[in-house]
Amino acid sequence: MKKAHLTVQSNSEIADRIYKMVLKGELVRHLTEPGQFLHLKVSDAVTPLLRRPLSIADVNFAADEVSVIYRADGEGTRLLAGKKEGGRIDVLGPLGNGFPVRRIEPGKTALLVGGGVGVPPLQELSKRLTEKGVNVIHVLGFQSAKDVFYEQECRAYGDTYVATADGTYGEKGFVTDVIREKQLEFDVLLSCGPTPMLKALKQQYGHKEVYLSMEERMGCGIGACFACVCRTGESDTSYVKVCLDGPVFKAEEVAL
């Protein structure tokens, strides 16, 4: 983990309340594992006190640039949405453990499933997998057409299916409906998104090799505050820290 000030290259709305921010700085050279995250200080003022954890969406090592995607819902992310080109942001990272790209052999097929703001980390993951010869299929889930983003970016690396809960774009239903109806075949499943989606994927495909990136509220981002603990399922008193031990876990390692 390193601490640095990165420069805002751009910051724009790409879907309903969904923003893409591109940051530049030497810290980017250390972002080698898809699925890790950055911890951004959103203001120089006393409040908001806590940093905001944002997953790494795309890395351009040649330009020392990293893209992060976030939904401007709360006070902190609304402050981020107001950041202008040329501004500086205090960043900690990379944090956490990412997806196991090295374990997936060339020629295998990986199914990447994202829901809402869980879609961004799949972009860099897809890029890294295809670079090593892994076949990639994407299934992206959103609430409505206005929420859809990153479809074309995913299509650049492999077949991509989009589902919306209200049926206003792509297939109507949930990501699990698409996987079943399209009869998608895969060797390994990697997913990031809301807990109900991850739970459904674990229930239906837990007999296969499945990796889940957990979305939990975080305080410190380094495992000190215990705000993001998740039960392991071994017992009612056995927990892991999502920020430190995760955010990516094998499906059987966590209770959902």
UniProtKB/Swiss-Prot annotation:
FAD-binding FR-type domain ranges (all copies): 1-101
UniProt pathway annotation: Pyrimidine metabolism; UMP biosynthesis via de novo pathway; orotate from (S)-dihydroorotate (NAD(+) route): step 1/1
Record note on cofactor: Binds 1 [2Fe-2S] cluster per subunit.
Coiled coil start-end: none
A Pfam family annotated for this UniProt entry: DHODB_Fe-S_bind
Assembly with partners or alone: Heterotetramer of 2 PyrK and 2 PyrD type B subunits.
Protein known as: Dihydroorotate dehydrogenase B (NAD(+)), electron transfer subunit
Lineage of producing organism: Bacteria, Bacillati, Bacillota, Bacilli, Bacillales
